[in-house]
Amino acid sequence: MKIAIDAMGGDHAPKAVVLGAMKAIKEYSDLHITLVGKEEEIRQYLTNEERITILHTDEKIEATDEPVRAVRRKKQASMVLAAQQVKEGKADACISAGSTGALMAAGLFVVGRMEGIERPALSPTMPTVGGEGFVMLDVGANVDAKPIHLYQYALMGSVYAEKVRGIKNPRVGLLNVGTEDGKGNDLSKQVFSMLKDAPIHFVGNVESRDLLQGVADVVVCDGFTGNVALKSLEGTALALFSMLKEQLMSSFTSKLAAAVLKPKLMTLKDKMDYSEYGGAALFGLKAPVIKAHGSSNDQSIFSAIRQTREMVAKEVIPTISSVMEKEPLR
């Protein structure tokens, strides 16, 4: 199995990418990794070249670049070359912690959209109180959506939850302003009607306040709603931990309590860190394309590689393609 990784993408590249890749190579004997980026910088951290090759390029896509224009003009950028490896059959999948917009553009223009899929979806796995996590799609690939798009998201998310996350008959929920039938705007009502007859385990409408309680294994929404929900969850978690830290450091007594509670608090923090689940998969493409978090450390990169490997090994893309072929046009 071969995975191409944009070694220059992310806040801590290339160090985090290289260290994460070496960790993955040590863990999985069937894995070969191509690191795409500046060879001199990559070699500063590469201490084990077993099953790791370097594809050198001096060019990379910056966070300030306009995504689509950058992908079209910077043909030798590390992210574009990683996607090109997939297109040419030299890699089974690719990963980048770089610009989300640019990776989506590279996925569409270089890797290509799967036949039958109208719009791709960006889908992270989010944490839950019980530790199971849930898949949410879309969180920003398309801010405007049609009913057919969300219908296809539900099918793709269900396949992923079952194949990669090992959930039998995963529960699929539609993110809405209430749980009752008939709630929401015209888009929500149309999608609800379609999902009731879909070949999935549809559990109806779900509210954002219940997401972390694990109300569904797959949560479907348009990209605008999903992005707002995602960032609200992120911001709330960060604010709560910040407030808790402030209170625990406010007095000598509370500092003693903090010392006692530290292991439990760290466990809780890790449990709520969605980067531990891997990256956000870009569903609807001809091959797995994974967006790792921009602030990924080596463990986060390793998690993204593990996730990508599972997608390839469990044949997620061929399964989604097969499901879509059986679905009538709506």
From Swiss-Prot:
Record-linked InterPro entries: FA_synthesis, Phospholipid_synth_PlsX-like
Gene Ontology terms: cellular component: cytoplasm
Main location per the UniProt record: cytoplasm
E.C. numbers: 2.3.1.274
UniProt GO BP: fatty acid biosynthetic process; phospholipid biosynthetic process
Subunit structure, as described in the record: Homodimer. Probably interacts with PlsY.
Function: Catalyzes the reversible formation of acyl-phosphate (acyl-PO(4)) from acyl-[acyl-carrier-protein] (acyl-ACP). This enzyme utilizes acyl-ACP as fatty acyl donor, but not acyl-CoA.
Assigned protein family: Belongs to the PlsX family.
Name of the protein described by the UniProt record: Phosphate acyltransferase
